Design a protein with these regions (language model features):
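Well-ordered, non-transmembrane segments within structured domains
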Residues: 2-3, 163-168, 262, 266-270
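Electron-transfer interface patches adjacent to heme c in soluble/periplasmic c-type cytochromes
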Residues: 31-54, 64-142, 152-153, 178-278
Length: 278
């Protein structure tokens, strides 16, 4: 009888501890969900007056303005849908361009057009691609905001028909999981697990379709905390910075490959850029 009583007491204690753990987990999950909902409500309130719209208008002016030694505009720039056709184009990038002989993302393609159509110098164009706090948006930030806005609502479909496109995606996947730096981090350290966050910022699991769609569709974005439009190239650059990796060069092959990998993961999503971020 005593043995039976002791066994029953132990089982009751285990059950109580299990119930407590489940309750704690449930409360934690509820708190996280509530936090996410609060953040989303905040974004929704701000989205009605997204300052990125002003940057988009500036980008439209730059797109139409004749510049460079050739005194030409960018209106014949081909982003994959044909010269000058912008609607839905960025939802299918990065992609292979036969005239350049390589895979390009939106930003490297814009630089290519500025060089080939306008006769401008690539080093001059890319020497300062990102604005600093309190500065006006750069030419590239403005152009990016404008061209992305023309694909808002388009379905993401990053092509994989060309061997170079497949190779770019494969390299991007390797980079995503590659661990290095003083913290032995990879992109996957933050973005390959569910329900992770840093401070109030949720970290999407980019190996899953829905989170990948939401993330890819939202960039470029107006970053409220910085008062600036930040592009997808900047997003890759800043992730490398946070991992304490060597500085990611603007328009580098590694950056394009990572964006290709994420774009393929995001297939079927709906473009929302230029969106609003914290």
């Amino acid at each position: 009888m005593r043995q039976t009583a002791r066994t029953a007491a132990k089982l009751a204690a285990v059950a109580f501890m299990g119930a407590g753990a489940m309750a704690s987990f449930s409360m934690s999950a509820h708190a996280q969900k509530t936090t996410e909902q609060g953040i989303q409500e905040y974004r929704d309130m701000l989205a009605d007056g997204n300052p990125a719209e002003l940057v988009e208008l500036r980008g439209e002016d730059i797109w139409q303005k004749p510049q460079g030694p050739k005194n030409a505009s960018l209106e014949q720039c081909d982003l994959g849908a044909g010269p000058g056709k912008l609607e839905g184009a960025v939802a299918t990038m990065p992609r292979f361009f036969s005239d350049a002989g390589k895979v390009m993302d939106v930003e490297t393609r814009l630089v290519h057009c500025m060089v080939t159509l306008q006769g401008r110098d690539v080093a001059e164009i890319t020497k300062k691609p990102y604005s600093s706090a309190g500065e006006k948006p750069t030419e590239l930030e403005s152009l990016v905001a404008y061209v992305y806005a023309q694909s808002r609502g388009a379905t993401i479909k990053v092509p994989q028909g060309h061997p170079e496109e497949k190779a770019s995606r494969a390299r991007g996947e390797k980079i995503f999981f590659y661990r290095a730096g003083p913290y032995d981090f990879s992109c996957a350290s933050c973005h390959a697990t569910d329900d992770q966050r840093i401070r109030l910022q949720g970290l999407p699991n980019l190996t899953k379709p829905e989170p990948a769609q939401a993330a890819f569709a939202a960039w470029p974005a107006y970053r409220v905390s910085q008062g600036a439009v930040r592009s997808m190239q900047w997003r890759m650059y800043d992730c490398f910075r946070q991992q304490r990796f060597p500085e990611l060069k603007y328009g580098s092959q590694a950056s394009i490959d990572l964006i290709t990998f994420l774009g393929v993961k995001a297939e079927g999503g709906t473009m929302q850029a230029t969106s609003l971020k914290r």
